[in-house]
């Protein structure tokens, strides 16, 4: 939102019984929750529709890059389009009909809405090494370490696209400290942006080295070598050579065909989006059920939509868990956590969540060559706000103004 001024106050507390830790999108879900709650309160106070109040105060896409009140520069985004897409996807205009139907079944239907912006930067340095092997495979060494994000797939896609080779001929080597000389790790939504960028650079370097070798094989100048559809060809010859051909023909004289590239990026990017949640509360038992969840997430250029959707779904599950279930309870006498294992701890299950209606927006970031933002934390960032606001909306007839988490 176009908030002209901001005042920040921080308080540091030392404790050995923390109730939370740095978590997915750490800090941003809580800030988004506070802002979206305040918008709802303000809208009620001035007698204005909360959705219209949000639209009235959105940052325009024409204002990008936008410097906010605390000095952060939002690189790109179209927040109004996110809102419009999400409300259409969520069948916003037919909510009243669903609410009446729910009431007939003894249910209280509520709806929550949240826009979000989150930041992604992480360790600025990353290195990629690409080597053509004699078994006609490419080995890519990179310093990230996935924990289910599918790096092996999406990283291979980036390299395959630039080098114009089949994706199944690429081997991604991760997490081996005997091989990885430099690596920033996987955190803060940095992996695809930093690794993708440096792998793209290394791929271009590999093509240039291959062109230099191909020029000697084709007996022409480097500028006369064309690379199309995975083949090097002289403009004056019909002979075509693949990367693997060049490696095989020049390995003895020039060594392995390879490229190494190190890169640093210090500018953050700002993934953003909109989330809408609907909940049903049983009017007798007050049992809570999330019935609909809709989200539109601007991740910049999306390399693999299926993986991004998986990241979004997982992030939503974590945010829903924080909003309605999870509580790190501590025994006040011993200081020990009461939940000794996940058997004793309230986390969301598949049955906790409805079918998630998610769409991806792709406003490319100008901060890196591939236009990537991030897709790992966007699901979590608006979840607290949209779930809690939906619950408060459902309980409006009881004049409930606030409710603490976990619900």
Annotate each predicted stretch with a short phrase:
Residues 1-107, 111-118, 157-407:
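C-terminal catalytic domains of large/alpha subunits in multi-subunit enzymes
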